[in-house]
Protein backbone atom coordinates (compact mmCIF):
# COMPACT_ATOMS: atom_id res chain seq x y z
CA UNK A 1 0.00 0.00 0.00
CA UNK A 2 3.01 2.27 0.29
CA UNK A 3 2.92 3.02 4.01
CA UNK A 4 6.30 1.59 5.00
CA UNK A 5 9.71 2.82 3.96
CA UNK A 6 11.38 0.57 1.36
CA UNK A 7 13.48 -2.29 2.67
CA UNK A 8 11.88 -2.59 6.10
CA UNK A 9 8.67 -4.56 5.51
CA UNK A 10 9.87 -8.05 6.43
CA UNK A 11 12.68 -7.20 8.83
CA UNK A 12 13.21 -10.13 11.24
CA UNK A 13 12.33 -9.50 14.88
CA UNK A 14 15.90 -9.86 16.16
CA UNK A 15 17.49 -7.75 13.40
CA UNK A 16 19.35 -4.62 14.52
CA UNK A 17 17.73 -2.57 11.73
CA UNK A 18 14.62 -2.03 13.88
CA UNK A 19 16.14 1.00 15.62
CA UNK A 20 17.09 2.50 12.27
CA UNK A 21 13.63 1.72 10.89
CA UNK A 22 11.96 3.45 13.84
CA UNK A 23 14.18 6.53 13.55
CA UNK A 24 13.75 6.92 9.79
CA UNK A 25 10.01 6.24 9.98
CA UNK A 26 9.56 8.83 12.73
CA UNK A 27 11.45 11.45 10.74
CA UNK A 28 9.47 10.66 7.62
CA UNK A 29 6.14 10.94 9.44
CA UNK A 30 7.08 14.43 10.65
CA UNK A 31 8.15 15.39 7.11
CA UNK A 32 4.84 14.06 5.76
CA UNK A 33 2.95 16.33 8.15
CA UNK A 34 4.88 19.34 6.83
CA UNK A 35 4.25 18.18 3.25
CA UNK A 36 0.55 17.61 4.01
CA UNK A 37 0.96 14.07 2.66
CA UNK A 38 -1.71 11.92 4.29
CA UNK A 39 -2.09 8.12 4.17
CA UNK A 40 -5.25 8.63 2.11
CA UNK A 41 -3.12 10.37 -0.54
CA UNK A 42 -1.20 7.13 -1.07
CA UNK A 43 -4.25 4.90 -1.50
CA UNK A 44 -5.97 4.08 -4.79
CA UNK A 45 -7.64 1.12 -6.47
CA UNK A 46 -4.26 0.45 -8.09
CA UNK A 47 -2.40 0.44 -4.75
CA UNK A 48 -4.91 -2.07 -3.37
CA UNK A 49 -4.47 -4.26 -6.48
CA UNK A 50 -0.70 -4.08 -5.93
CA UNK A 51 -1.17 -5.11 -2.29
CA UNK A 52 -3.36 -8.06 -3.31
CA UNK A 53 -0.84 -9.09 -5.97
CA UNK A 54 1.99 -8.98 -3.44
CA UNK A 55 0.07 -11.02 -0.85
CA UNK A 56 -0.69 -13.62 -3.52
CA UNK A 57 2.93 -13.82 -4.69
CA UNK A 58 3.86 -14.47 -1.06
CA UNK A 59 1.01 -16.98 -0.64
CA UNK A 60 0.28 -14.72 2.29
CA UNK A 61 -2.20 -15.14 5.08
CA UNK A 62 -5.86 -15.67 4.27
CA UNK A 63 -6.47 -13.04 6.97
CA UNK A 64 -4.96 -10.48 4.60
CA UNK A 65 -8.14 -10.76 2.53
CA UNK A 66 -10.26 -9.57 5.45
CA UNK A 67 -7.81 -6.81 6.39
CA UNK A 68 -7.30 -5.43 2.88
CA UNK A 69 -11.05 -5.44 2.15
CA UNK A 70 -11.71 -3.64 5.45
CA UNK A 71 -9.01 -1.03 4.79
CA UNK A 72 -10.24 -0.45 1.24
CA UNK A 73 -13.82 0.04 2.37
CA UNK A 74 -12.78 2.35 5.19
CA UNK A 75 -10.80 4.45 2.70
CA UNK A 76 -13.71 4.56 0.24
CA UNK A 77 -12.45 2.04 -2.33
CA UNK A 78 -14.10 -1.10 -3.64
CA UNK A 79 -12.31 -4.37 -3.02
CA UNK A 80 -14.18 -7.64 -2.79
CA UNK A 81 -13.66 -11.40 -2.99
CA UNK A 82 -14.34 -11.43 -6.74
CA UNK A 83 -11.47 -9.02 -7.36
CA UNK A 84 -9.15 -11.08 -5.13
CA UNK A 85 -10.11 -14.18 -7.10
CA UNK A 86 -9.55 -12.52 -10.49
CA UNK A 87 -6.10 -11.30 -9.46
CA UNK A 88 -5.21 -14.69 -7.91
CA UNK A 89 -5.78 -16.46 -11.23
CA UNK A 90 -2.93 -14.53 -12.88
CA UNK A 91 -0.38 -14.14 -10.05
CA UNK A 92 2.26 -16.84 -9.47
CA UNK A 93 3.49 -17.72 -5.99
CA UNK A 94 7.15 -16.68 -6.01
CA UNK A 95 7.99 -16.79 -2.29
CA UNK A 96 9.06 -20.26 -1.18
CA UNK A 97 8.16 -19.55 2.45
CA UNK A 98 6.15 -21.46 5.04
CA UNK A 99 3.50 -22.73 5.20
CA UNK A 100 3.34 -23.04 1.39
CA UNK A 101 7.11 -23.44 0.93
CA UNK A 102 10.11 -24.55 2.93
CA UNK A 103 11.85 -21.35 4.09
CA UNK A 104 11.19 -18.88 6.91
CA UNK A 105 10.27 -15.20 6.48
CA UNK A 106 13.73 -14.41 7.83
CA UNK A 107 15.20 -16.24 4.83
CA UNK A 108 12.87 -14.24 2.59
CA UNK A 109 14.18 -10.97 4.03
CA UNK A 110 17.83 -11.93 3.49
CA UNK A 111 17.03 -13.22 -0.03
CA UNK A 112 16.02 -9.70 -1.03
CA UNK A 113 12.70 -9.25 0.74
CA UNK A 114 9.65 -7.50 -0.53
CA UNK A 115 11.54 -5.15 -2.86
CA UNK A 116 13.04 -8.12 -4.71
CA UNK A 117 9.71 -9.96 -4.83
CA UNK A 118 7.85 -6.93 -6.22
CA UNK A 119 10.62 -6.35 -8.75
CA UNK A 120 10.37 -9.99 -9.85
CA UNK A 121 6.61 -9.58 -10.41
CA UNK A 122 7.36 -7.12 -13.21
CA UNK A 123 4.30 -6.05 -15.17
CA UNK A 124 1.90 -7.68 -12.69
CA UNK A 125 2.56 -4.63 -10.48
CA UNK A 126 1.72 -1.04 -11.39
CA UNK A 127 4.85 0.89 -10.47
CA UNK A 128 3.21 4.31 -10.74
CA UNK A 129 1.76 4.28 -7.22
CA UNK A 130 3.31 6.59 -4.65
CA UNK A 131 5.05 5.50 -1.46
CA UNK A 132 5.35 7.23 1.91
CA UNK A 133 8.88 8.32 0.97
CA UNK A 134 7.44 10.34 -1.93
CA UNK A 135 8.84 8.07 -4.64
CA UNK A 136 6.93 5.73 -6.92
CA UNK A 137 6.84 2.00 -6.35
CA UNK A 138 8.92 1.52 -9.51
CA UNK A 139 11.60 3.85 -8.15
CA UNK A 140 11.61 2.05 -4.82
CA UNK A 141 12.06 -1.44 -6.28
CA UNK A 142 14.44 -0.42 -9.06
CA UNK A 143 17.76 -2.20 -8.69
CA UNK A 144 16.40 -4.71 -6.15
CA UNK A 145 18.23 -8.02 -6.32
CA UNK A 146 17.26 -11.57 -5.46
CA UNK A 147 20.09 -13.14 -3.44
CA UNK A 148 18.61 -16.64 -3.22
CA UNK A 149 16.50 -17.74 -6.19
CA UNK A 150 15.18 -20.75 -4.30
CA UNK A 151 13.60 -18.50 -1.66
CA UNK A 152 12.32 -15.85 -4.10
CA UNK A 153 11.65 -17.74 -7.28
CA UNK A 154 11.96 -16.22 -10.74
CA UNK A 155 8.64 -15.49 -12.39
CA UNK A 156 9.42 -18.14 -15.01
CA UNK A 157 9.89 -20.84 -12.33
CA UNK A 158 7.32 -20.10 -9.60
CA UNK A 159 6.55 -22.25 -6.59
CA UNK A 160 2.95 -22.40 -7.87
CA UNK A 161 1.66 -21.04 -11.20
CA UNK A 162 -1.30 -19.16 -9.68
CA UNK A 163 -3.95 -19.16 -6.97
CA UNK A 164 -1.86 -18.53 -3.85
CA UNK A 165 -5.27 -17.97 -2.27
CA UNK A 166 -8.58 -19.08 -3.77
CA UNK A 167 -12.09 -17.85 -3.19
CA UNK A 168 -14.68 -20.58 -2.68
CA UNK A 169 -18.40 -20.03 -3.14
CA UNK A 170 -21.44 -22.25 -3.00
CA UNK A 171 -24.10 -23.48 -0.63
CA UNK A 172 -21.59 -24.05 2.20
CA UNK A 173 -20.13 -20.55 1.78
CA UNK A 174 -22.82 -18.37 0.17
CA UNK A 175 -20.89 -15.18 0.97
CA UNK A 176 -17.55 -16.74 0.06
CA UNK A 177 -14.63 -18.34 1.83
CA UNK A 178 -10.86 -18.21 1.31
CA UNK A 179 -8.43 -21.12 1.17
CA UNK A 180 -4.66 -21.34 0.64
CA UNK A 181 -4.13 -24.38 -1.64
CA UNK A 182 -0.31 -24.20 -1.70
CA UNK A 183 -0.30 -24.78 2.08
CA UNK A 184 -2.72 -27.72 1.96
CA UNK A 185 -1.28 -31.17 2.54
CA UNK A 186 -1.56 -32.97 -0.82
CA UNK A 187 -1.72 -36.36 0.92
CA UNK A 188 -5.03 -35.30 2.49
CA UNK A 189 -6.61 -34.06 -0.74
CA UNK A 190 -9.48 -36.50 -0.28
CA UNK A 191 -10.84 -34.26 2.47
CA UNK A 192 -11.83 -31.72 -0.17
CA UNK A 193 -13.71 -34.15 -2.42
CA UNK A 194 -17.34 -35.15 -2.36
CA UNK A 195 -18.02 -38.72 -3.34
CA UNK A 196 -21.28 -39.37 -5.16
CA UNK A 197 -20.94 -43.16 -5.19
Go through the PLM ranges and name each one.
Residues 1-197:
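Catalytic or ion-coupling anion/metal-binding cores of large enzyme and transporter domains
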